[in-house]
Amino acid sequence: MFGSCQAYSRELVMATTFSPSATAWIIQRWQTEPGSVMIRTLNRTSGSLEQLLDTANAENVDLILTSSPMLLQHLQEHQKLALLDSAPAASQKLVPRSIRSTSVAVAVSGFGLLINRSALAARHLPPPADWQDMGLPSYQGALLMSSPSRSDTNHLMVESLLQQKGWTAGWATLLAISGNLVTISSRSFGVADKIKSGLGVAGPVIDNYANLLLNDPNLAFTYFPYSAVSPTYVAVLKNSRHADEARAFIHYLLSPKGQRILADANTGKYPVAPLSADNPRAAQQQRLMAQPPLNYRLILKRQQLVQRMFDTAISFRLAQLKDAWRALHSAETRLKRPLPEIRALLTSVPVDAASSEDETWLAQFDNKSFAEQKMMEWQIWFLNNQRLAIHKLEELK
């Protein structure tokens, strides 16, 4: 499959959904290898890469490095990826079954909370430990996150919450958190950058973005108690002009030397090969690997539903949501009791759990007019619920 590293003067173009800092160390170390080929990275969102590669491959991309199985599934369905065989079993068991013929897992990451200690101290707040904590009223105007439609990394984090807590309880948690958001970041690594700058005190991020910032004493990262494992995948474009060199790079990443480099804290990731017991990062790697895998079939089937629901429920009405939650928190504080009926109006979604797993119904979201009609219905539904919640709050004054 992979071949050996030989001397090439040509340049490899690697499209990636990761930030430049997340790939710099790996590429830097690769390029110290005898006979290695230069790698130029093209850093884009998944959506941007889909558009680029669905048309003529104008940038002459040779391979893809991403944590997004959705992007790879899309490219595979459009016959854009080359077949890859003979990958190690330990690597391939981490790859969703539907893309195993074209994609290889070379590293893993986990999800958690990046926290700005100084910003937290300025507000006299304890650090949040999990999704549930982020919905507490004390974090009003203090949190940041991205959205599934803007970031596939965020999509996987949201799906891990929905799968672990269940559809209904998961959305209730997300909607409670929405009342505490400063803004919705356009990129998942933008969340980390904004927290570092002090725009917010905490936010959910993938560990490799957080770990690269932890030389800043004001920042801390804590994994979610049951963080799902998020593999880093590599795939070769079918029309790559340098397929042998691309395979050589993948071979290097999976080699003992490549895995040692991926084990280095400078990558912010963990290798797929087990770390030795005396490695300080071994325990967290084992915890991640021990978690049940996400249901990727379900993720892929309801990708459109989750993205459109998040934007309709949260992104497109964030200002109104924050006002409604501020009013609810104020009323609960004043009355010194919870208001579950009003809270239920602000934490419900107009799609039930059974529908969220109904593949026949979910397939209809591939029809743009159906999806847009549903979003219009949801907008009205959320607006009516919010108006009713505000009306009930005013009655309590």
From Swiss-Prot:
Its main location: membrane. Pfam families: SBP_bac_6. The chain crosses the membrane at residues 102-117. It is found in: Cell membrane. It comes from the Bacteria. GO terms for cellular component: outer membrane-bounded periplasmic space; plasma membrane. Coiled coil: none annotated. Keywords: Cell membrane, Membrane, Signal, Transmembrane, Transmembrane helix. It is a single-pass membrane protein. Residues 1-24 form the signal peptide. Required for pgtP expression, it may act jointly with the PgtA/PgtB signaling proteins. This is Phosphoglycerate transport regulatory protein PgtC. It comes from Salmonella typhi. The gene is pgtC.
